[in-house]
Swiss-Prot record:
GO terms for cellular component: plasma membrane. PANTHER family: CHLOROPLAST ENVELOPE MEMBRANE PROTEIN, CHLOROPLAST ENVELOPE MEMBRANE PROTEIN-RELATED. This is Proton extrusion protein PxcA. It comes from Thermosynechococcus vestitus (strain NIES-2133 / IAM M-273 / BP-1). Required for H(+) efflux immediately after light irradiation to form a rapid H(+) concentration gradient across the thylakoid membranes. Together with PxcL, contributes to transient H(+) uptake following dark to light transition. The gene is pxcA. It is found in: Cell inner membrane. Belongs to the CemA family. The keyword GTP-binding does not apply.
């Protein structure tokens, strides 16, 4: 009886060892089962097509399937990471000979994926090769589906498309459905905005209005489905665009603040010598400290003169010495503060660039979203926004705002105030900005909304 605890401990250790040794097999099996669950949902509810928010009905059904898909894909990715990491140190059963694919070529991969997913679920124990093939096919399929959705969201809504644009969009959808690798089949000629902006004898606004009347009078179910799909696309586009714009603002700011407090500040504080560089660059800091100390000394002496009980000279000297020590501490902090700002701003800017370079498709969606918002405004609203924007940045009172902005920027990076540089900047940059505004109005807004330009001229006069 006394050996029971040791037997239990030995069994527990043996079970833990067995669990550890079977980690690759267990992780692969969980990823494989998640892939089969996705395939089962596709066959049961989506006629074998990928699960897409553009094809889901609005409401709780859409939320349920989106959440289920995200959880299953996350399970696959996490288990495959666990599988790859554990495979470096733990053995796994050798690969069996790969099964013969059903078809070769572009569409063969999709057919092989379907057959493998359905057949493997009925066999007793699929090989490692079959499991990996099903998992890879699932991940690749939804990667292409995600790219297809982002491309669809980057296109204008139906209300802003003319018939030619709609035909080209339909051609892109057909290519995306038939191709295995989306990027190899989409031509730049089809996606170029310059092709869509070609001039025509009949204004495109008239063509869009006529096409909208045709679609509204058409009782075809396909037309209604197209309108519903356009609404879902617009809803999803708004959500993704707002989320990405918030990421572009919040994530770099958080990186700048957190890195400055946790990484940059402790690192720079250990190197006091860096303050000597700032002392040479910006001598105004020392002048400000001396001026503040002089004002404090004059204030103490003035209080001593007007007081009924004069302050003793020793007390005055002690107060001045304490103030000098306090100002010296602040002076040392101000000397190294610009370097902290530069390093933390560089980290935040790096995060911003990383988001921009890795989110090219999201940027296209943001551009389409902003086009929908700006060009959807009335002519009076467009003219009002243009006048407000130009008056704030290049108007009569804008030099005062630019002066404050440039001065704060120089102070943030530890440079002394330079009146010549500030005056030169104010004399050149707003002028260039005003030129850009006028060129945009002449080049783009005059073609898209001539009435808005006329309203702007009348309001500006």
């Amino acid at each position: 009886m006394s050996s029971n605890p040791f037997i239990g401990l030995r069994n527990w250790i043996r079970g833990a060892q067995q669990w550890y040794l079977t980690t690759p097999k267990r992780a692969l099996q969980e990823a494989y089962e998640a892939a089969l669950k996705i395939r089962a949902i596709e066959l049961e509810h989506f006629d074998g097509q990928p699960i897409s928010p553009l094809n889901l009905p609005v409401g709780e059904v859409s939320s349920y399937f989106e959440t289920e898909l995200k959880q299953l894909l996350k399970t696959i990715r996490m288990r495959m990471m666990e599988f790859r990491a554990s495979r470096q140190i733990l053995p796994l059963a050798p690969f069996q000979s790969p099964p013969t694919p059903v078809n070769e070529g572009i569409n063969g991969a999709t057919e092989t994926y379907t057959v493998t997913a359905t057949v493997s679920s009925t066999t007793a124990e699929p090989s490692v090769y079959e499991k990996l093939r099903v998992i890879d096919a699932t991940l690749n399929r939804y990667k292409r589906q995600r790219e297809k959705e982002l491309d669809a969201l980057a296109r204008p809504s139906l209300s802003r498309q003319d018939p030619q644009q709609r035909q080209q969009a339909a051609a892109l959808d057909k290519i995306a459905e038939d191709s295995l690798y989306l990027s190899e089949y989409i031509s730049d000629d089809l996606t170029s905005d310059s092709k869509l902006d070609s001039s025509s004898f009949i204004p495109r606004s008239i063509l869009r209005t006529a096409d909208r009347f045709r679609r509204e009078l058409n009782s075809d179910e396909a037309t209604e489905a197209e309108v519903v799909r356009d609404f879902r696309t617009s809803k999803l586009r708004t959500r993704l665009a707002v989320r990405f714009m918030l990421l572009l603002v919040i994530l770099p700011l958080l990186t700048q603040q957190i890195s400055k407090a946790l990484i940059v500040s402790p690192l720079v504080n250990h190197f006091k010598a860096v303050g000597q560089i700032e002392r040479i660059i910006n001598s105004q800091l020392e002048d400000n400290i001396l001026d503040e100390l002089a004002r404090f000394e004059n204030k103490i002496r003035f209080e001593s003169l007007v007081s009924n009980v004069p302050i003793a000279p020793e007390e005055i000297q002690n107060r001045i010495r304490e103030k000098a020590i306090e100002l010296s501490t602040e002076y040392q902090k101000e000397l190294i503060e610009p370097l902290k700002n530069i390093l933390s701003d560089a980290l935040g800017f790096t995060v911003f660039l990383a988001l921009v370079f890795t989110g090219q498709r999201q940027l296209a969606i943001v551009k389409t979203f902003l086009d929908e918002v700006v060009y959807g405004l009335s002519d009076s609203a467009k003219a009002f926004m243009i006048i407000l924007f130009t008056d704030v940045f290049v108007g009569f009172h804008s030099p005062h705002g630019w002066e404050v902005l440039v001065n704060n920027t120089l102070e943030h990076f530890g440079f002394p105030r330079n009146e010549d540089f500030i005056n030169m900047f104010i004399a050149t940059f707003p002028v260039m900005l005003d030129t850009v505004f006028k060129y945009w109005i002449f080049r783009y807004l005059n073609q898209i909304s001539p009435s808005a330009v006329a309203t702007y001229k009348n309001m500006n006069e």
